[in-house]
């Protein structure tokens, strides 16, 4: 049994957390861990009195929070697209680059040419780097195989990964091939029962799948026992976020072009709005999710990195910082979006908050209070990362 003492402890008290819900901010705090599980939380004075014989790890100058959960990544691919940054700076849009054979199509080519073992090595290295920034659970999608055999291959690689943290697997129906769109959807429907992932996700947008195709795919996935996620309203609004009324979608992601009236549909459905501020930066767009309406209607907000060849960021700390400076979340909202609500978007209710009975996925930060997680930009502030009570990184 171990007691971790900290200058400040911050956690949501419920999952999902909604705007103006209560939050625990405990100064001179302590957490008790036994066998990888949190068994007690309180002030240092309370905890040392209740557990006088436990070992003590004293981080009395530091902040402790739940481990970060990254609920939206595209970690499994080969190659890079750094040349496309110059094209974007010259005025080409993401959609234009994709339609000319770049973007996703370019990454598909690199990924197909890379062996299973090399892809697995790439994936494992990326997960390890994400962990060093405080991520203790990560969602990873397929999506860069394009043809069905390649997508099932990527799903097999995903399921074989050996990782120091938990990996939630998603079969992403990413983008249709340049020709044979109708037949491709039929092939997807046949393949879904064989994916073996936890989630199925569809990129529903102007350059990807339309609403009817997305509805058909997600309905089939739900019937096959998969949980559902959705890329919605990223590049344009074509009606994708309306699907939360019809299907049990755990998380609707991006939402840059979601009309305010659709926020009510999201709120009523219980779907989490997963926002991806790094992508807003890399798309060089002025569009932003309707945050004020989400707050008003108390939609649970999560954030993720959206790591991909288009937004090369494994660092959830950066997502927190940009959620504050680009989207206007408070540091406290951003932290909870990266912990309790990110976990809830994956329906992982055994982590993401610091409470007795929850898994001891925790981060000790080299800062004195939670404000510094956004106030200081650009440094890795994670001092100690704990997965089920075991240290993963210590500086």
From Swiss-Prot:
Function noted in UniProt: Catalyzes the hydrolytic cleavage of the carbon-nitrogen bond in imidazolone-5-propanoate to yield N-formimidoyl-L-glutamate. It is the third step in the universal histidine degradation pathway.
Gene behind the chain: hutI
Name of the molecule in the record: Imidazolonepropionase
Residues engaged in binding Zn(2+): 72, 74, 231, 306
Record-listed E.C. numbers: 3.5.2.7
Pfam families: Amidohydro_3, HUTI_composite_bact
Organism annotation: Pyrobaculum arsenaticum (strain DSM 13514 / JCM 11321 / PZ6)
Keyword vocabulary terms for this entry: Cytoplasm, Histidine metabolism, Hydrolase, Iron, Metal-binding, Zinc
Keyword Iron part of the UniProt annotation: yes
Binding site for 4-imidazolone-5-propanoate: 81, 144, 174, 234
């Amino acid at each position: 049994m171990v007691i971790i003492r900290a200058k400040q402890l911050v956690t949501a008290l419920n999952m999902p957390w909604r705007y103006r819900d209560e939050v625990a901010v405990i100064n001179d705090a302590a957490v008790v861990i036994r066998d990888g599980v949190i068994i007690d939380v309180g002030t240092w004075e309370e905890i040392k009195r209740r557990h006088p014989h436990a070992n003590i790890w004293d981080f009395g100058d530091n902040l402790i929070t739940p481990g970060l959960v990254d609920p939206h990544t595209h970690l499994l691919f080969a190659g890079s697209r750094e040349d496309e940054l110059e094209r974007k700076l010259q005025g080409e849009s993401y959609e234009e680059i994709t339609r000319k054979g770049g973007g996703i199509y370019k990454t598909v080519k690199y990924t197909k040419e890379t062996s299973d073992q090399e892809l697995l090595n790439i994936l494992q290295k990326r997960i390890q780097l994400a962990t060093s920034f405080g991520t203790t659970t990560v969602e990873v999608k397929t999506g860069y195989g394009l043809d069905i055999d390649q997508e099932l291959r990527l799903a097999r690689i995903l399921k074989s990964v050996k990782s120091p943290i938990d990996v939630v697997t998603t079969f992403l129906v990413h983008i249709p091939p340049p020709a044979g769109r109708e037949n491709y959807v039929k092939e997807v429907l046949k393949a879904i029962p064989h994916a073996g992932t936890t989630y199925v996700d569809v990129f529903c947008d102007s350059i990807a799948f339309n609403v009817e195709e997305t509805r058909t795919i997600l309905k089939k996935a739900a019937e096959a026992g998969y949980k559902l996620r959705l890329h919605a309203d990223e590049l344009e609004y074509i009606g994708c976020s309306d699907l939360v009324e019809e299907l049990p979608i755990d998380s609707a992601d991006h939402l840059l072009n979601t009309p305010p009236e659709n926020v009510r549909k999201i709120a009523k459905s219980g779907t989490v709005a997963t926002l991806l501020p790094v992508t807003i930066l890399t798309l060089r767009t002025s569009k932003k999710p309707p945050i004020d309406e989400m707050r008003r209607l108390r939609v649970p907000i999560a954030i993720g990195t959206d790591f991909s060849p288009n937004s090369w960021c494994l660092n959830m700390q950066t997502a927190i910082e940009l959620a504050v400076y680009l989207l206007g979340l408070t540091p406290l909202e951003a932290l909870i979006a990266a912990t309790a609500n990110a976990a809830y978007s994956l329906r992982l209710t055994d982590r993401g908050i610091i409470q007795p009975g929850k898994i001891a996925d925790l981060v000790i930060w080299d800062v004195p209070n939670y404000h510094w997680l956004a106030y200081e930009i650009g440094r890795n502030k994670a001092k100690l990362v704990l997965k089920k009570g075991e240290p993963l990184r210590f500086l």
